[in-house]
Amino acid sequence: SAYGTSVVETSLKSRKVMEYELLDYETTGDMANFTGEQAFTRALVGLFTEDEQHVYFVTGHGERDLAENYWQVKSLLDGEGYVTRAVNLATTGRVPEEAAILVIAGPRKDFTKEEIYAIEAYLDEGGNVAALLDPLGQADDLPNLKEMLRNQGIGVNDDLVIDPGSHYFLDMAGVIPKTRSHLITERLVTKDLSTFLPRSRSLYRIDDGEKDWESSSISVEPLLETTDEAWGETDFASEATFDPKIDMPGPLTLAYVVKHELGSSQARLLVVGNASFLDNDIVTFQGNIDFFMNSVGWMTGKKDSISIRPKTPSYEQVYLSDRQAKSVFYSTVMVIPAAFALLGVGVWVRRRNL
């Protein structure tokens, strides 16, 4: 083989790992992440897997872009042997047959009824869907998409979740939810890893009496929940304060999984009231990427991939809310210098009076 190329092979197939696949440089060019583990894993999966599993990300409604917003997610999916693709349902008219999962990541515009029919047909055939929804204000109302999720057992609230009981620093809309027990989350719980969901909307389970389905054919389980102190803010024009007349009281659910029995097959869904938790600058927070990748493994039946992944080196950044930034500014630029100035004046006066 060519210099710098590794080859893994069996008696029937072979896969090459190129030198450029072993390192992934940041856009600054200053730091390289070692991606050899993912590259060799991808090669081995290709050797021993008959059919590659494709993960399709929906486009056409202002969703997150794989190359720009979700490149770290794409890298992890590629590294674990998945094939990532984009699909515009308005042009294809259907979900591709080879799709193992269809990801709807933060749509800003609603789906047409024809697109909804295509997704429902995919689910009826035992497909898997991950719907990640931003709160109202970051996206338009999504009546068609919400109705489709409602038919699968999940209701979507038009609110912004505020949680004084568990949040990131001083940002009460940056929720760090409690993790419920499930195959997807059990290792997160064991390792005491949290997830961080900045600016979320709440979800709820549709009662069986509201829809005509057999309760035994569908199961809906919560994964992420707020504390009892949380509420779903519905008045976006004023400061966030709980109003029992219009706001949703806590605890609130931020993520569900749905399993729908379809005779010889199953449809599986992940619904999260947040799409930002997979953004490039947030996905490295503790358990965020593991939560999503474990969900992918659960939906595709790859139980061996449900684990805690090694972290790649990264620049540590501090994210400050407006209140935090003002606090840092006043303390470092005004309070501390003023304190030293007063101390100096006091020493000078004391020495002068001696």
Question: What spans do the regions from the language model cover?
Answer:
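Short, surface-exposed patches at the edges or C-terminal ends of soluble domains, predominantly
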Residues: 1-354
